[in-house]
Amino acid sequence: MNNHFKCIGIVGHPRHPTALTTHEMLYRWLCDQGYEVIVEQQIAHELQLKNVPTGTLAKIGQQADLAVVVGGDGNMLGAARTLARYDINVIGINRGNLGFLTDLDPDNALQQLSDVLEGRYISEKRFLLEAQVCQQERQKRISTAINEVVLHPGKVAHMIEFEVYIDETFAFSQRSDGLIISTPTGSTAYSLSAGGPILTPSLDAITLVPMFPHTLSARPLVINSSSTIRLRFSHRRSDLEISCDSQIALPIQEGEDVLIRRCDYHLNLIHPKDYSYFNTLSTKLGWSKKLF
């Protein structure tokens, strides 16, 4: 055992037997290597582990040096929104589909993780967005997002009208099905499907991508990540909401605005030593290979 990481947290929400098998294999291997291991409570219950340290995501964030998330990008997003509040490194073993955020190959995870635990890895900081639904007379409702914050109708798809202010200066009004506000991390997710640009992770930028706008002149906009975005609504409707990473929904009541800004904390994401962002893009998106 080395001094880079002493306490390892095992995180995830296993939906398939293969993911559960990976959790168990990882737990046994880390214990055999002499690491202190803390297991998320649901995983310990599923594996029927007795007399082992368990905890919530918050407890893991407070106590562990590294959290290993087993699952797909959805699992990673759900865990990372909480873990980002703490000074903890996060890495993922891919048991999902695309796996933009979960780098470790499940068939070779232990060897790759061994290198990481020995200090041979690449680290980067990914910023989050903070979304507030607020009105002067009402208490704020706040959530965070690693990928994107999406304005959309709550139940039935329909055109909505809204105004966008950037740093309290009017930018544009829009009639569309909604708006995607994305981080660089989220630029390869929902935003990409809506025609948004791909931003490399180190860019301090946010994209605003219209969803089915009513005019052809509406185009994606890239702004500095230090900007504050305010959404105002010309026709009040009770069925509007914003969603964070397609996992948390905040309803918008009459008279309320939405404020979106860069979060004060970052996700400490680490990758295997041979990680390449552009190689990941090429592989996941099916880009063509080198010509010569």
Swiss-Prot record:
GO CC aspect terms: cytoplasm
Keywords for this protein: ATP-binding, Cytoplasm, Kinase, NAD, NADP, Nucleotide-binding, Transferase
EC code: 2.7.1.23
InterPro entries assigned to the protein according to its UniProt record, in alphabetical order: ATP-NAD_kinase_N, ATP-NAD_kinase_PpnK-typ_C, NAD/diacylglycerol_kinase_sf, NADK
Active site: residue positions: 73 (proton acceptor)
One GO term (biological process): NADP biosynthetic process
Main location: cytoplasm
Catalytic activity: NAD(+) + ATP = ADP + NADP(+) + H(+)
Cofactor requirements of the protein: a divalent metal cation
NCBIfam families: PRK01231.1, PRK03378.1
Record-stated family: Belongs to the NAD kinase family.
UniProt function note: Involved in the regulation of the intracellular balance of NAD and NADP, and is a key enzyme in the biosynthesis of NADP. Catalyzes specifically the phosphorylation on 2'-hydroxyl of the adenosine moiety of NAD to yield NADP.
Record's protein name: NAD kinase
Organism: Salmonella choleraesuis (strain SC-B67)
Gene: nadK
